[in-house]
Amino acid sequence: IMEKIYRSGLIFLMVALFSCGTGEAQKSVSLGPQEFEKQLATEGERILLDVRTPGEFGERHLTGALNIDYNGADFNSRIGNLDKTQPVYVYCLSGGRSAAAAQTLTDIGFTKVYEMKGGISRWIAENHPVEAENYNPNKGMSLQELQAMINAAQDSIVLVDFNAAWCAPCKKMKAFMPALIKECSGKLKVIYVDYDNNPQLVSAMKVASIPALMLFQNGIEMKRYAGFVPQEDLKVAISTLLKP
């Protein structure tokens, strides 16, 4: 009897371990633009998902893409209505929103999720095709206009901040900028550049993702940051530049 109980317990343990092993969460696959395009071309039925804002989508997007704004109130309900048996290819501007969206898709049961590394910014930089019905490459500030603004502040450090209304880390940094300006005793001038409304400047300054920050002194770019930068780190960098 004891032997039977032992065997039964062993079988139960093996089944439990097997069940745990097969219960691992699904993960999305990250692909570079070239591989992303190649796989899209060879895939049969699939969903191509652009998770940027409608405004961003209207300017430039991949052919055949469906737009569901990751930050939209209806994001979860809309992706919940998609066919979970089809592979999903997802992208955004530079990869932040698409990575989060890919995680959400796998969490709700999509088993084949592919996310584009570097987003549409990298896609365009590598000369892959886009649809651009409403895109005006010349709108917004020119490089010459920006340079004039920088040169006009010769006695200060100039911080050029590329941001967007939908960018969470951009908002976080914008909130502490007034305090940073005060800490720098009037020696810091901040120029905000909206990423979506200044495409020619984005291209000229080679901004691939946001937030993007540049520090200028005497009209010369001294330091560049990609991504969120803590207030204290910026203060240290600015103080270093201000030292005689």
Label every model-predicted segment.
Residues E3-Y6, C20-R46, P54-P87, R97-D155, ...:
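Rhodanese-like catalytic fold shared by cysteine-dependent sulfurtransferases
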Residues G9-S19:
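Bacterial N-terminal signal peptides
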Residues P54, L93, D161-C167:
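Aromatic-flanked redox-active Cys/Sec active sites in thiol-based oxidoreductases
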Residues N67-G72, F162, I181, G186-P199:
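Thiol-based oxidoreductase modules, predominantly thioredoxin-like and allied folds used
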Residues S156, F162-W166, S209:
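Short pre-active-site segment immediately N-terminal to redox-active cysteine/selenocysteine motifs
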Residues A165-K172, A212:
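C-type cytochrome heme c attachment motif
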Residues K171-E183:
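Typically the conserved alpha-helix immediately C-terminal to a functionally engaged Cys/Sec
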Residues M205-M214:
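Structural micro-motif
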